[in-house]
């Protein structure tokens, strides 16, 4: 037996089978750094049409989690796909660097500002801490393969950014949107500060639910309201509340003029309830012998005076539009300093706005009975006191959704304080913002309705904070009237100039006289700006000012929580400062959860960290998982899910390796064969690749990364792995090295590789770089500077063997493979090359298959394939799952060729080569080798 190994075209490539990504990726990153790859991209695409994806700043505190990784990877994929489409698509990373979380970290080490450490030194430590956190996160983002201007990121602590925030505020004031107000705002006792809507999250809380009796002072007036002559017992207005701690601040009871109210006798007293709530309320009280005495409307009750349940204070009954008879009692306890509706009613009727609760959540010294107590702890004492005073009608517990601080996870209170607001109504900001939302493209589409609802119902934006680490509000107000200084705009621009030079410290360390001359009449405001104003100003501070970028951004892409956060604050800042929306399109992705749909939590032990993933599996696995997951909803990740992703990656890598290894000896300059002269199957491969490329580019353009990932996987596994590459192995390995059949396949492979590596590049950035290095090419450009491959061709419209034809051939081949598997399981054959395949076809299928002539066997990977009319079928033939087709498999008895392993009667025909077939002899001995037309 001769050794024919040297006569075969065995595959050869430098591209390894094993990814070994965790070790290789840092080396590739190092190469990119040395090449200055991001700078080269910017230079290469300078002057092209721009595409701007504006980065929403992550908070500079702690290592990145998998949600951060998903967000940056998705952005990177989109940027890279836009670059492939020929856009100048810069990516400038940003970071949010002011605010309470950083203050808290610095406090742990240095103590509170103004106590253990000076405020100036405290700010320096905050700045130092933020910069350190940025470097930690930056290293992780770069390790993920995210390309961007990492050397010049935008930090909200950059002096120019801080200054431009002040200039943005000046524009907002100039446009008439700023207002000062004494209003109830969400207040965190742990933060010691007001919170913006975006900083409030809702969680279940168990609260006391009590019904309180307010004794009616003038029974005769009440009797008259119900059309009665008199009342012979005391009467009580009943309110229901889940915040007993607000009762010291009660100033009124609200009813609705349009609702009906009932007077009910219970033993020796009367109570007032909304008519529609009588039955369920009495049931809640477990009272069965009550008697409804009379009914009246709410407008008859207004003006009647009640008595506070434990203070010597008169409480009027007033009309309130917010009062309903859906729940409670239909009479609403009103504490103007602790609720928005309460405050509105209080302003309307000039009720007392006395402050009973301090910023730390304790009652002030002027709060009788409870001075100094923490409000939530005082609930039990208040309930006890109501019982002693015989003013407690009912006491229960309720589990309900309650506002909590997003940082401390502790319950919030509504507290009226003097604050600065961006008014939603003053200059029609709400209506303008709602119109801008309509003019923006939202994906998923429900995002539009979500943000519309939020903007429609949101209160004025409280932008002032009582914190140390933040951009100063930089305002001066009159010491008596508290009106803004008449030269506020000029002063703000002056402040901005100083901050641009020395940072926010230039304000905090300056005397008022450095900015104004009228220090006897005016004083500076010590508040800082809401940290959401920092990030919300990014479109004004970055897009509108950086000539490398453009306003508005083409795309904002963040998590779905940003409808109430950055999407909304960006919109409000831009609309109030510039009068136009900051974005053309807004995309949201879901949160990352575990495989059971649970939120990531250390206590559950289900946290998947990006660092663990890239240090074990590699960043490309994390990138592939991110791209493969439909990010419009929750994104599930776990070790098992990542293992499946790694399996998918191996299939893609093996496909690339097979393609590359079969280009050995191919010269793309001299060996390329024109499309019309290729073997028909190779024409199909190129046309099919073109079809997939069109779909992939369309999916990238729609930011449908999961569709891209599915298409690439299907292309590699089905179109290539299960069909094309499986068929051409014989031709690649056994045909004459420089013969037409092999060069034809290599031409197709060359085109496929150049298309495939570009499809992969946005997602599998490290692997694509590795493939590119191993690819034959006629350019010195790195893959990051390439555009979509243009060397593919489609079939002409009149092509006989077009994509539709080959799709039918694939169906038939799948059926043949199914029957081959049956015969393998029956031990009739061990491999398909041992099979003699006979296909019995009706007229339609016969016509399809006969076009392939004697090359049908190569498509079926068998040694012999016969085509016969269906009428000749035998009892041993098996019906295909295609109408008009029967398949018969028998074991071929002819000898095996030791070179190509086909069974052939021609083995031994040539006395010089006794153990190989005539086809192999032809490939070894003749100048041209065998010829192929179809497969």
From Swiss-Prot:
Its EC number is 6.1.1.5. A motif ('HIGH' region) lies at residues 58-68. ATP binds at residue 602. NCBIfam families: ileS (TIGR00392). It is found in: Cytoplasm. This is Isoleucine--tRNA ligase. Pfam families: Anticodon_1 (PF08264), tRNA-synt_1 (PF00133), zf-FPG_IleRS (PF06827). GO terms for cellular component: cytosol. IleRS has two distinct active sites: one for aminoacylation and one for editing. The misactivated valine is translocated from the active site to the editing site, which sterically excludes the correctly activated isoleucine. The single editing site contains two valyl binding pockets, one specific for each substrate (Val-AMP or Val-tRNA(Ile)). A motif ('KMSKS' region) lies at residues 599-603. L-isoleucyl-5'-AMP binds at residue 558. GO terms for biological process: isoleucyl-tRNA aminoacylation. Monomer. Coiled coil: none annotated. Keywords: Aminoacyl-tRNA synthetase, ATP-binding, Cytoplasm, Ligase, Metal-binding, Nucleotide-binding, Protein biosynthesis, Zinc. The keyword Nucleotide-binding applies. It comes from Francisella tularensis subsp. mediasiatica (strain FSC147). Catalyzes the attachment of isoleucine to tRNA(Ile). As IleRS can inadvertently accommodate and process structurally similar amino acids such as valine, to avoid such errors it has two additional distinct tRNA(Ile)-dependent editing activities. One activity is designated as 'pretransfer' editing and involves the hydrolysis of activated Val-AMP. The other activity is designated 'posttransfer' editing and involves deacylation of mischarged Val-tRNA(Ile). Belongs to the class-I aminoacyl-tRNA synthetase family. IleS type 1 subfamily. The keyword Nucleus does not apply. Binds 1 zinc ion per subunit. InterPro entries: aa-tRNA-synth_I_CS, aa-tRNA-synth_Ia, Anticodon_Ile_BEm, Ile-tRNA-ligase, Ile-tRNA-ligase_type1, Ile-tRNA_ligase, M/V/L/I-tRNA-synth_anticd-bd, Rossmann-like_a/b/a_fold. It comes from the Bacteria. Its cofactor is Zn(2+).
């Amino acid at each position: 037996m001769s050794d024919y190994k040297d006569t075969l075209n065995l595959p050869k490539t430098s591209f390894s089978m094993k990814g070994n990504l965790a070790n290789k990726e840092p080396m590739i990153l190092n190469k990119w750094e040395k090449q200055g790859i991001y700078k080269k991209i910017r230079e290469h695409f300078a002057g092209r049409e721009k595409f701007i994806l504006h980065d929403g700043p992550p908070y500079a505190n702690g290592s990145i989690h998998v949600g951060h990784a998903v967000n940056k990877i998705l952005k990177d994929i989109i940027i890279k796909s836009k670059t492939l489409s020929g856009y100048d698509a810069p990516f400038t990373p940003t970071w949010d660097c002011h605010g309470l979380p950083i203050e808290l970290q610095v406090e742990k080490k240095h103590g509170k500002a103004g106590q253990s450490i000076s405020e100036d030194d405290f700010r320096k430590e905050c700045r130092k801490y933020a910069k350190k956190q940025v470097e930690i996160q930056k290293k992780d983002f770069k390790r993920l393969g995210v390309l961007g201007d990492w050397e010049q990121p935008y930090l909200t602590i950059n002096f120019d950014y801080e200054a431009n925030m002040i200039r943005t505020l000046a524009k907002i004031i100039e446009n008439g949107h700023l207002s000062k107000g004494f209003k109830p705002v969400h207040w965190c006792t742990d933060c010691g500060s007001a919170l913006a809507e975006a900083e409030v999250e809702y969680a279940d809380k168990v609260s006391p639910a009590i019904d309180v009796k307010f004794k009616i002072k003038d029974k005769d007036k009440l009797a008259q309201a119900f059309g009665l002559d008199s009342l012979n017992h005391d009467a009580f207005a009943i309110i229901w509340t889940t915040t007993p701690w607000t009762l010291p601040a009660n100033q009124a009871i609200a009813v609705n003029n349009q609702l009906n109210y009932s007077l009910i006798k219970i033993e020796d007293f009367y109570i007032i309830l909304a008519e529609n709530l009588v039955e369920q309320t009495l049931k809640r009280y477990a009272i069965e012998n009550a008697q409804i005495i009379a009914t009246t409307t709410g407008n008859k009750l207004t003006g009647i005076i009640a008595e506070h349940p434990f203070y010597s204070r008169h409480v009027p009954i007033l009309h309130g539009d917010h009062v309903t008879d859906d729940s409670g009692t239909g009479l609403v306890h009103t504490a103007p300093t602790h609720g928005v509706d309460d405050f509105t009613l209080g302003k309307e009727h000039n009720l007392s706005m006395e402050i009973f609760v301090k910023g730390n959540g304790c009652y002030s010294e002027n709060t009788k009975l409870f001075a100094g107590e923490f409000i939530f702890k005082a609930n039990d004492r208040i309930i006890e006191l109501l019982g002693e005073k015989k003013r407690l009608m009912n006491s229960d517990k309720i589990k309900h959704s309650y506002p909590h601080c997003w940082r401390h996870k502790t319950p919030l209170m509504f507290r009226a304080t003097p604050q600065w607001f961006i008014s939603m109504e003053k200059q029609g900001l709400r209506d303008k913002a709602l119109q801008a939302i309509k003019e923006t493209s939202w994906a998923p589409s429900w995002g539009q309705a979500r943000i519309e609802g939020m903007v429609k119902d949101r209160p004025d934006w409280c932008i002032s904070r009582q914190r140390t680490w933040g951009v100063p509000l930089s305002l001066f107000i009159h010491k008596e009237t508290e009106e803004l200084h008449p030269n506020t705009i000029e002063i703000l621009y002056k402040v901005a100039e100083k901050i641009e030079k020395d940072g926010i410290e230039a304000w905090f360390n300056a005397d008022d006289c450095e900015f104004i001359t009228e220090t006897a009449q005016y004083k500076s405001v010590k508040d800082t700006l809401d940290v959401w104003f920092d990030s919300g100003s990014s479109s004004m501070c970055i897009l509108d000012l950086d000539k490398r970028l453009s306003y508005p951004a083409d795309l904002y892409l963040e998590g779905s929580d940003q409808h109430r956060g950055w999407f909304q604050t960006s919109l409000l800042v831009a609309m109030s400062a510039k009068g136009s929306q900051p974005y053309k399109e807004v995309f949201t992705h879901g949160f990352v959860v575990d495989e059971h749909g649970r939120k990531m939590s250390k206590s559950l032990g289900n946290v998947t960290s990006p660092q663990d993933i890239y240090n074990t599996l590699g960043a490309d696995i994390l990138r592939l998982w991110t791209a493969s997951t439909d990010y419009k909803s929750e994104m599930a990740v776990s070790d098992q899910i990542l293992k499946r992703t790694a399996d998918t990656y191996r299939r893609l890598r093996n496909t690339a390796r097979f393609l590359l290894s079969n280009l050995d000896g191919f010269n793309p300059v001299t060996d390329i064969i024109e499309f019309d002269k290729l073997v028909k199957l190779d024409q199909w491969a190129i046309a099919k690749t073109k079809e997939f490329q069109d779909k992939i580019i369309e999916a990238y353009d729609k930011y449908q990364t999961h569709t891209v990932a599915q298409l690439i996987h299907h292309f590699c596994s089905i179109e290539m792995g299960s069909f094309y590459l499986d068929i051409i192995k014989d031709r690649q390995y056994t045909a004459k090295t420089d013969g037409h059949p092999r060069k034809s396949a290599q031409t197709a492979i060359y085109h496929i590789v150049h298309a495939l590596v570009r499809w992969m590049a946005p997602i599998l950035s490290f692997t694509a770089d590795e493939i590119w290095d191993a690819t034959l090419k006629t350019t010195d450009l790195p893959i990051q500077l390439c555009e979509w491959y243009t060397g593919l061709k489609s079939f002409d419209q009149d092509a006989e063997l077009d994509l539709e034809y080959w799709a039918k051939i694939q169906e038939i081949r799948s059926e043949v493979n199914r029957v081959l598997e049956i015969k393998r399981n029956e031990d009739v054959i061990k491999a398909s090359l041992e099979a003699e395949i006979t296909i019995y076809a009706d007229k339609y299928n016969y016509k399809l298959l006969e076009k392939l002539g004697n090359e049908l066997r190569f498509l079926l990977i068998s040694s012999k394939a016969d085509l016969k009319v269906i009428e000749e079928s035998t009892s041993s033939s098996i019906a295909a799952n295609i109408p008009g087709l029967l398949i018969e498999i028998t074991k071929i008895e002819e000898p095996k060729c030791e070179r190509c392993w086909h069974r052939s009667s021609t083995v031994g025909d040539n006395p010089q080569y006794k153990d190989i077939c005539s086809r192999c002899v032809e490939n070894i001995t003749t100048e041209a080798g065998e010829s192929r037309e179809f497969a």
